[in-house]
């Protein structure tokens, strides 16, 4: 009976695994001409998985009924919230890929299969209740991501991005494994509940180093300073649909996993990791903003923007309260929409031959040549900057509010001050598009799926998005409470 209950809880993961294997077989037998069909089937699988996990989120599932395989897997509402964000992000990335790869005659059915496998790994990551489960999910995601980064085999930038991601990712995995071995050595267990119980009271120096190494390994996955060095090169070199994927779904999974690890197995030793998270948050905000200022390549700029936004997300985690975690999830959801919209807009910047345009010089005067695209980008950039009344302001507001409520007034003040620096390079987007002389380089026609996603993202981050804040706040409060109950 217990096995049946456990299998029911992991049904979305089972469906994704079976679907991925079936799609691989279809690809092997039929060949590249099935690329679009495989993409549609992969997106349908992810949509079905999202429907399966939705009831756990809306009901606020938590406690023993959400535990599978003796604590190895947790299907609570916190995991469900993260999974829905991950699945929807992956679906968006599948929608935008064909138009990009078709121009290069590189649309292969392996792309949606790899996205599906990476998403399966992320799904396992956010539901991990054991260090071993954590590592299995993380590596399944990472191995698929390495291949995706170098998907354009004949493109030197893509190959370089894949190689850098692989080498630095392997280093991060080694650091994480070493930390896990120290935690196991000093607690005698890999189970989150067991580790939490063993770390009650005074923490040994060895266990403290284990916590530090585990968090360092996870910091690489979320691209937090000082483990951010791979992000600009990989984001610039990888195909833009892959970069979009990296900036959204894996970011959600890694942040959710970091929160679960910090508050579940290490929840009794908040003081051991809180200062680390505060440092990473402030360093990411400042270095992300400063690094972006001198960039001329738009993809590299958005990579630094991603690092900057991770800092704001980590402020919510640093608060280590239900309100802080809820604010973190709220910001994460808003960030996914902003990032997806921004990279879709970059995909739409191309000349008459379909060649991508990726520099500020290419978008000079865009408001006169492509006004709809320019206005959508304006909404997204101002929202990323946190300028009211756009929805990005609300994300920053709830994060800073949670920090103040947790008596971290100085952290909130420093975060607000640093966000002013970050606003500079977002405003540069607007200045170039609306006030520079037009160059009229953007001439290519855009795919319908691109326009649909871009307009949807622009509407969500507009003041109309505030209509969703009550509903979103209820979901994030439920998800955050479930993690604290599990802890």
Curated annotation (Swiss-Prot):
Biological processes per GO annotation: ATP synthesis coupled electron transport
Subcellular location: Cell inner membrane
Membrane-spanning intervals of the chain: 7-27, 37-57, 81-101, 112-132, 166-186, 207-227, 237-257, 276-296, 307-327, 329-349, 373-393, 407-427, 452-472
Claim: NAD is one of the keywords in the record: yes
GO terms of molecular function: NADH dehydrogenase (ubiquinone) activity; NADH:ubiquinone reductase (non-electrogenic) activity; quinone binding
Membrane topology: Multi-pass membrane protein
Catalytic activity: a quinone + NADH + 5 H(+)(in) = a quinol + NAD(+) + 4 H(+)(out)
A UniProt-annotated Pfam family: Proton_antipo_M
Top EC category: translocase
Listed EC numbers: 7.1.1.-
Origin superkingdom: Bacteria
Main location, first listed in the record: membrane
GO (cellular component) term, any one: plasma membrane
NCBIfam families hit by this protein: NDH_I_N (TIGR01770), PRK05777.1-3 (NF004440)
Family label: Belongs to the complex I subunit 2 family.
UniProt xrefs under HAMAP family: NDH1_NuoN_1
Function: NDH-1 shuttles electrons from NADH, via FMN and iron-sulfur (Fe-S) centers, to quinones in the respiratory chain. The immediate electron acceptor for the enzyme in this species is believed to be ubiquinone. Couples the redox reaction to proton translocation (for every two electrons transferred, four hydrogen ions are translocated across the cytoplasmic membrane), and thus conserves the redox energy in a proton gradient.
Protein name (record): NADH-quinone oxidoreductase subunit N
